[in-house]
Design a protein with these regions (language model features):
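Alpha-to-beta junction loops
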Residues: 60, 77-86, 168-177, 181
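Acidic, polar ligand-binding/catalytic clefts
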Residues: 52, 64-127, 136, 140, ...
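Short helix-initiation/N-cap motifs at beta->coil->alpha
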Residues: 63-74, 155-165, 169
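Ligand-binding clefts/hinges and TM-proximal coupling segments of bilobed small-molecule sensing domains
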Residues: 61-64, 138-154, 158, 226-268
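Ligand-binding cleft/hinge of the Venus flytrap
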Residues: 37, 51-60, 101-103, 124-128, ...
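Periplasmic-binding protein-like
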Residues: 28-30, 106-111, 187-226, 244-264
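Extended ligand-binding regions for polar small-molecule ligands
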Residues: 45-57, 117-121, 125-131, 137-138, ...
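Short glycine-rich His-centered loop
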Residues: 19-46
Length: 268
């Protein structure tokens, strides 16, 4: 029996070694429910499960490259990664010509978040001059006019989790978060301590970009993502980590810049 188990283990190890490798990028700014990173490798989370699932679909071995978000486009251009997931066309300065887009896979909302008990909806242009919690390297197109005019001032953290933790601790009065991360952060808190979504700032359909290279199964991977989306597998992964689709009916805020704007922002 032991010999049989040893042979099965050896066969499994050799089979994995024979599989082609596909290099997936992982942004170090991601936190749960997107991904949890241990020893510079993702070990669980929505995107970890999605990337593992699509790798199984096409019979490749995933290799995860954790890097700063600001390095992702450089890594794509230099050929250091094969697949980048959880990305929007709005986030790229220049689209790498040798990458192909998948179909939209996940719908994301960015929301303005207030402290516990601060549940009154407020459009961002009505915020008084203040620092606002943001993630280092992330762009917030809806808020950019307010940042440019000095009404708001970025208070950057390295991850979305740190942004929400600092808001909870009172470092600032408002922050920006994607809806999934906010729901995950709140799920273990009593209702009176939960952070509040005050306005939807933006919505994006996110997908994956795959290197168009004959050395990797580009079209097979794109077709696998289509099958996973059509079968409901991706939605099941999202729900596994607390995603509820469309949690409320708040409309997307489009700030109007007042004619007179304070010249400088002020910190809390």
């Amino acid at each position: 029996m032991r010999r049989l188990l040893a042979l099965l283990l050896l066969w499994s190890t050799n089979s994995m070694a024979d599989q082609p490798v596909l290099r997936f990028s992982v942004a170090e700014s991601w936190s749960m429910p997107l991904v949890r990173i241990e020893d510079d490798q993702p070990v669980e989370g929505l995107l970890h499960d999605l990337m593992q699932a699509v790798a199984r679909e096409v019979g490749v071995r995933p290799e995860f490259h954790v890097m700063a978000r600001l390095r992702l486009e450089e890594a794509m251009s230099s050929g250091d990664i094969d697949v980048r997931c959880y990305v929007s066309t709005q986030w790229l300065n220049d689209r790498p010509r040798d990458f192909v887009w998948s179909i939209p896979l996940i719908h994301q909302r960015d929301v303005l978040v207030g402290r516990a008990g601060d549940s009154t909806p407020i459009p961002p242009e009505r915020l008084p001059p203040q620092a606002i919690g943001t993630v280092l390297g992330y762009t917030y197109s809806t808020l950019q006019p307010l940042l440019d005019h000095g009404q708001l001032h970025r208070e950057d953290s390295r991850s979305q989790l740190l942004v929400l933790q600092k808001l909870q601790a009172g470092r600032y009065r408002h922050a920006v978060s994607n809806q999934l991360s906010l729901q995950w952060f709140n799920q273990g808190l009593p209702a009176e301590q939960q952070l509040q979504a005050l306005a939807v700032l933006d919505e994006q359909d996110l997908g994956c970009m795959v290197r168009n290279d004959p050395a990797i199964p580009t079209q097979g991977l794109l077709r696998a993502l289509v099958r996973m989306k059509q079968s409901g597998q991706i939605e099941r992964i999202v729900r596994r980590y607390g995603g509820t689709g469309d949690p409320d009916s708040m409309s997307v805020a489009r700030p109007e810049i007042p004619s007179k704007m304070p010249a400088h922002s002020q910190r809390n």
